[in-house]
């Protein structure tokens, strides 16, 4: 279902992402100035990876309103597809708001996270914080999947408690 707000509501199955963890509790989502993140991506990109590039945000911390851990790496079909030494994050099946953008880094990421923030502020989505997923279909594109609450009909629940 395509929203008038520039995102789609979709169902996703379980997604496994293998890669390297970056612990960044003080870095706000969408902010890219983190040398640890840059080093992790450099290390991942120097290996043969088992699937499309991806990144997950896991281990949500309400006290900082962000995630403690980001896994930078690649999607894999099974645990056996992961490169030795990489950790695996599991993004559960469910209903997601899919935000997509094209362009150059870091602007493309800043635009995406601004869209998420706007959708939350406007009450268009209510996030579940069970794990966010960034997928990179090609060098200048990012698809961002945000897990959301839905009502019994499958419509997004707003942050205000209203059903849409």
Language-model segments: what does each one mean?
Residues 1-164:
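A solvent-exposed interaction/effector surface
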